[in-house]
């Protein structure tokens, strides 16, 4: 696709306007607490922005348009499932998590299951989110290389630079500010594009004449089981992710945490629909293109150049903001749950730089890993990420929330260990080809129910 000077200028201004508030917010960061949880003073808007900045990534925009090109409404599951997961998080998890005044998921699990659970949770969450960073980086790398026609090394430099500008100096506050601006850009460009695509297809009547009702207008275009697995995976993945929990920890109080999470859910749910419309429009008018190019090609071809540039900026910020938010989550766990346990006499400035350098290390490590696996499948890393996060975090955390202090600690640790083992080795030891997240959750539930029945007696 050919970009004009107007596209480039509009895109550059969009990136600058989005990055600037976050960089200005960095001036208020004086400690690791300010960096990791915004000094626990975030309002509902910043909580929502932090969540949106990470969850609305390349999968919610480019990936949704790609699947919309192939299957229609089935592609909505990513943002619909994310929104449902965030509503559950707001209803059941936000208040007890914020009330704890902690910083990481591992710290929360330690309160019920002891120190061994903290190490297992740190491994599970860090490894799981790292592979999610890998998946997002792989997508962003090829997107930038294809969009601007630059070599992969130059694309890698752009990814690292923008990722660090988003979170290296300002941490969670910068991520939240960028998230707020990003959603405004998406509504201003991709939503406009989605409505125009819908209108150009002849509205509902024209679409029903051009597409068969199944699979194009069904959420279960690949079957009921596939749809329910998609929903379940999103719930497990969102609730198990440090970055979203970290946003709740940053809220000024429990009510703000719940309201911010709920606001994020209500914004995230409809975000996928315009991308679906654009994907279907491109399938109808350009069936010969590579499906992953559906959204950027539409923005360049069918929108005014200045608006198309804004849309491309929103797409890039979606992909790179997700990487930045996830890297911040992993960096926080490394600095809080590992470095702080080793570097006991660290000063406030030392703790702050430990957090920043952890984010840098995660970003660079993910890029190096991607270059070692350039031909790998994004979906492969997403599956591994989901299995690792869900196996060590989701059900143990859920039992902590619903049955606080009632599960025997040794069984909680056993549940986490067995789940992580299943996530890592199931496909190597089992004759059944199923997603390793399912057996991991079964192992979790088995030990947690025993621990709940056994109780805390004798511990």
Stretch-by-stretch model annotation:
Residues 1-459:
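Membrane-embedded helix-loop-helix hairpins and adjacent transmembrane boundary segments
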């Amino acid at each position: 696709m050919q970009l004009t000077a107007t596209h480039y200028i509009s895109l550059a201004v969009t990136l600058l306007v989005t990055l600037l508030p976050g960089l200005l917010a960095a001036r208020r960061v004086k400690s690791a607490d300010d960096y990791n949880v915004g000094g626990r003073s975030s309002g509902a808007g910043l909580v929502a922005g932090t969540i949106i900045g990470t969850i609305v990534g390349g999968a919610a925009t480019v990936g949704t348009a790609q699947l919309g090109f192939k299957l229609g409404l089935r592609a909505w599951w990513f943002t619909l499932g994310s929104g449902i997961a965030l509503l559950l998080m707001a209803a059941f998890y936000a208040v007890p998590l914020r009330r704890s005044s902690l910083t990481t998921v591992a710290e929360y699990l330690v309160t019920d299951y002891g120190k061994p659970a903290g190490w297992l949770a740190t491994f599970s969450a860090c490894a799981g989110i790292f592979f999610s960073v890998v998946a997002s980086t792989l997508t962003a790398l090829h997107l930038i290389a294809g969009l601007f026609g630059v070599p992969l090394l130059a694309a890698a430099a752009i990814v690292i630079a923008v990722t660090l500008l988003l979170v290296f100096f300002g941490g969670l506050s910068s991520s939240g500010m960028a998230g707020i601006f990003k959603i405004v850009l998406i509504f201003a460009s991709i939503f406009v594009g989605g409505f125009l695509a819908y209108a150009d297809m002849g509205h509902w009547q024209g679409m029903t004449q051009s597409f068969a009702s199944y699979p194009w207008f069904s959420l279960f275009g690949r079957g009921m089981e596939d749809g329910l697995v998609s929903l379940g995976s999103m719930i497990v993945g969102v609730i198990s992710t440090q970055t979203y929990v970290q946003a709740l920890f940053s809220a000024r109080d429990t009510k703000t945490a719940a309201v911010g999470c709920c606001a994020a859910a209500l914004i995230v749910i409809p975000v996928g629909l315009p991308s679906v419309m654009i994907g279907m429009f491109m399938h109808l008018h350009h069936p010969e293109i590579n499906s992953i190019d559906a959204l950027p090609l539409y923005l360049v071809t069918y929108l005014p150049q200045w608006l198309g540039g804004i849309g491309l900026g929103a797409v890039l910020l979606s992909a790179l903001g997700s990487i930045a938010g996830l890297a911040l989550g992993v960096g926080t766990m490394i600095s809080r749950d590992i470095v702080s346990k080793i570097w006991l006499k660290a000063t406030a400035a030392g703790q702050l730089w430990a957090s920043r350098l952890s984010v840098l290390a995660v970003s660079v490590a993910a890029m190096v890993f991607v270059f070692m696996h350039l031909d790998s499948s994004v979906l492969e890393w997403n599956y591994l990420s989901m299995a690792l996060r869900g196996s060590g975090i989701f059900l143990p955390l859920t039992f902590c929330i619903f049955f606080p202090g009632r599960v025997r600690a040794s069984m909680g640790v056993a549940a986490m260990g067995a789940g992580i083992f299943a996530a890592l080795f199931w496909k190597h030891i089992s004759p059944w080809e199923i997603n390793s997240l399912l057996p991991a959750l079964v192992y979790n539930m088995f030990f947690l129910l025993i621990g709940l029945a056994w109780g805390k007696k004798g511990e």
